[in-house]
Amino acid sequence: MNFTAIDFETANSSRSSACSLGLVQVRDGIVTAEHVWLIDPRQRFDGMNIAIHGITPSMVQGQPTFEELWSTVEPLLQGEVVVAHNAAFDMSVLRYCLDASGNSYPDFQYLCTYLLGKKMLDELPSHKLNVISQHFGISLKHHDALDDARAAALILLKLMEQDQKCEPLLLADNQGYTAGKMFAGGYTPFKSPPKKAPRKKQPAKAPAFPPSAPSVKPYF
């Protein structure tokens, strides 16, 4: 049960505008380390984003840029199983920030608790982080990067317990998902295998009359 959960917050709609990163390490099913950083994105802050996470331009003044922070974060992700809620977003933020700073991608596999929750908790009206957290009784200050990362970690532990799987990758495989991968030069998404298209039925052939049969007019 070893994995690392992450969550990014952004200053605006650009995926390269990370302004906070939360990271939670789990070893043998127990949270063993938590980290949170404010990041100076060197970009504008949109009012809508500030309203969501509460991070303002003045709060990131003097904080490291992503490029400056990366040497600290990279060893915490390299070779890990990484987990995020709506991983498509967080992984795209990571890729965009790495591209913008000229850094190569680390090597790790990743899972998405949003998609796993959607598959395993289909009775819930929504599978947003706050809804699944409430379902499992997990305390959450939503859109705080550390709280969101911690909630994703605890949700994964609950899902593994529910599925009686002791490893994240076994859980994903058992639910029909392939782990996403990030590697030098590229990535693959966390996804379920494509559904096979149903075989088309061949149209039934009309029975042929014996050669000696008389012509018959159809009756409707």
Segments (PLM) and residue ranges:
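Acidic two-metal-ion nuclease catalytic site recognized across multiple nuclease folds
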Residues: L157-F220
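Conserved non-catalytic scaffold segment of RNase H-like nuclease domains
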Residues: M1-F108, D122-E123, H127-H143
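Short, flexible loop segments at boundaries between secondary-structure elements
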Residues: L111-D122
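Acidic, divalent-metal-coordinating active-site segment for phosphoryl/phosphodiester hydrolysis
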Residues: A145-L159
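Beta-strand segments within the central parallel beta-sheet cores of soluble alpha/beta enzyme folds
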Residues: Q109-C112, L171
